[in-house]
Amino acid sequence: MSEQNILKTPKGDRIAIVSGLRTPFAKQATAFHHVPALDMGKLVVNEMLERLNFNKSEIDQLVFGQVVQMPEAPNIAREIVLGTGMPVSVDAYSVSRACATSFQAIANVAESIMAGSVTVGIAGGADSSSVLPIGVSKKLAGSLVDLNKARTLGQRLKIFSKLRLKDLLPVPPAVAEYSTGLSMGQTAEQMAKTHNISREDQDALAHRSHSLATQAWADGKLKDEVMTAHLPPYKSFIEEDNNIRKNSTVEGYAKLKPVFDRQHGTVTAANATPLTDGAAAVLMMSESKAKALGYEILGYVRSFAFSAIGVEKDMLMGPAHATPIALDRAGITLADLDLIEMHEAFASQTLANMKMFASDKFAQEHLGRSKAIGEINMDKFNVLGGSLAYGHPFAATGARLITQSLYELKRRGGGLALTTACAAGGLGAAFVLESA
């Protein structure tokens, strides 16, 4: 292990994570069908604080994110503060970094603690694929503005006369990159072809993810980090993730047809993450504050890094770019890690990133490094399953990865973990965590 570099405050305090919690993750239009992301965010933050019997007056800041924005509540963080009984003086702002949003929220709180401006903070994210901001066409939107300014019936009728039936159709949120028009699935398909990721290998990874997640729930390993969510009108509840295939078989995956390239593709609904609803949060503070309040520390943020690459090709290669930076900042190598948690947006994207971890050619041509960071030991990789099984509420996944890693390190008696994710826009994130 090379020289250690640990994130600290000016007073020498490490950045501690005291608690992490999430809702169960639910497939679109199931358990959280009519529950907005804001309500899920309030639910998980309030439950986390209640479990700790935490004095809300101790909280200095809340940073939260949401990828699929709610127009009526653009600052989800502030609404969570106001909706959970925290003092109105608690600072709150929202962030968005696509699928790495809660990674960004956690990094922001960590930086505030390091700067000494915050002692206690909450970070996290929530997203709903069931309660969506359905928009209108640009032509209808422009006409509505013009109607508001029209003064006579004749002017209004003239505006209406220019509209066609197609202009009145609802417009769902975009699923493609604004700059390229490519969807995440199309990029996943491109990465599979470019890096020779077979359908069989993708299906095998998906089967592994579902099998390990099934076992994790059966063994009770997730009970402390996943709350039971009681839903209005409080006649039902959800206590486990409902996307996990408990009877997963490799043969079952082979039956599905490709989605994004129907003739020659390999990416299917089974080896990709589904649209998912859920929320996750972590409670952070300086090490000395945690000890002064008498709370057990789950772990520490050792380092973090973000990366950005082109979006035309290999847009989801963020982990392979961000991880070497985070490892260098932590003063460690890949071999020093006890756990590796990588967001499985698609099996093809995950396997392509794993390949690049071990590729000297990739390191030399894309990272400016003489050699690769190393091959991933599968005994350390996504040991409880990953996003392919749990699902992926965009803004919540980073907090899930970090919480899940710290609890697993604790069960194993300590160590170091890497959590990393790709994100839309060619972005990537990586965190190195240290068990308390």
Curated annotation (Swiss-Prot):
Keywords for this protein: Acyltransferase, Cytoplasm, Fatty acid metabolism, Lipid degradation, Lipid metabolism, Transferase
Known EC number: 2.3.1.16
Catalytic activity: an acyl-CoA + acetyl-CoA = a 3-oxoacyl-CoA + CoA
Listed Pfam families: Thiolase_C, Thiolase_N
An individual GO BP term: fatty acid beta-oxidation
GO molecular-function term, one example from the UniProt record: acetyl-CoA C-acyltransferase activity
Catalytic EC class: transferase
Active site (UniProt): C99, H392, C422
A single Gene Ontology CC term: cytosol
Pathway this chain belongs to: Lipid metabolism; fatty acid beta-oxidation
Compartment annotation: Cytoplasm
Record InterPro entries: 3-ketoacyl-CoA_Thiolase, Ac-CoA_C-AcTrfase_FadI, Thiolase, Thiolase-like, Thiolase_acyl_enz_int_AS, Thiolase_AS, Thiolase_C, Thiolase_CS
Family of this protein: Belongs to the thiolase-like superfamily. Thiolase family.
Quaternary structure (record): Heterotetramer of two alpha chains (FadJ) and two beta chains (FadI).
Biological function: Catalyzes the final step of fatty acid oxidation in which acetyl-CoA is released and the CoA ester of a fatty acid two carbons shorter is formed.
Name used for this protein in its record: 3-ketoacyl-CoA thiolase
